Structure formats: structure tokens, C-alpha cells
Amino acid sequence: VYKKEVLYYYLSREGSITHSSDFSRNYDDRTRSVDEVLEFFHEKGLDQIYRDELEYLVFENAYFVPSKEIVLNDRKSIYLDKFREYSLEKYPDLENNRYISELSGKDKILWALLRRKMYAVMVLMSQLRQIRDRVTGR
């Protein structure tokens, strides 16, 4: 469900892992966090019950989102491959997760470009969106 109204505000701090260009730290923090969640579900015997959801959690938090951030900062970073390898090691069929079909239109396009390693097109799309936002005052 998508709503246009703002339901919460959050504070984005300088140096947080969500905006850090220190990809080594970002990789370590994200993979450690995901490992802890996966371990919790495994210990509780819930990892197979929630397999699709956990697989999507890995896709979103340890592959798709960090890869988009890395592409915009350093398309040649080794961490693009490291995040991909980590995620596919956890869930080899991750790219066929049923929840991926529920991505927004923009993210479906970015996902298709990321899978094909068309990083320059991803950067161009981001730059065009920034220009549009400046022109329209968004």
C-alpha cells in the first residue's frame, strides 16, 4: 500500500550507514545485521516458515539498496560484487523472490539495470531525476 501523505519523519545523520560512502563499513554493518536476523529466525525454527520474507530482506538490505547507493558513488567498487555474492550465498535463487514483483515502477527499472550491470544508465536516471526535482521545486 502506498500513500502520498507523510506518516513519519526520520533523521538522517551524517556518517550513518545509510548514507556512508565508506563501503567497507557499510558492508560489515549491513551483513552483520542481516546475519543476526537470519540467525534469530533459524534459532527459533522459523527460517523456513518465513523463507520468502527473509530472502526478500536479504535482497532489499544486503543487495538492492546498498548496490544502488554504491553505483551512484563508485561504479567500480568491489563492494557491488561483495554485496551480490553475500546475498546469493544466503539465497541462491534470490533474484526470483516473489516480493520483487511488488517493487515500485522506478525500482523495477533500477533492478533490471542493476542485474544487467548497466550502471551508467542508473547514474543518468538519478541525475535526470535530480534535474527534474530542481526544475519542479520538489
Regions found by a protein language model. Give the residues of each.
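Nucleotide-sugar-dependent glycosyltransferase catalytic core
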Residues: Y2-S33, I70-D74
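Residue-level "edge-of-site" marker
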Residues: V6, L54, I100
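Short, solvent-exposed segments of well-ordered alpha helices
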Residues: S21-R25, E53, R115
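C-terminal, non-catalytic tails of nucleotide-sugar-dependent glycosyltransferases
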Residues: T31-E53, E89-N97
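Secondary-structure edge/capping motif, primarily at the C-terminal ends of alpha-helices
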Residues: F41-G45, K68-N73
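Short, charged, amphipathic alpha-helical segments
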Residues: Y50-Y56, L80-D81
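Amphipathic alpha-helical repeat scaffolds of TPR domains
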Residues: E53-K68
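Membrane-interface aromatic/basic loop that binds lipid-linked glycans or pyrophosphate carriers
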Residues: V71-R138
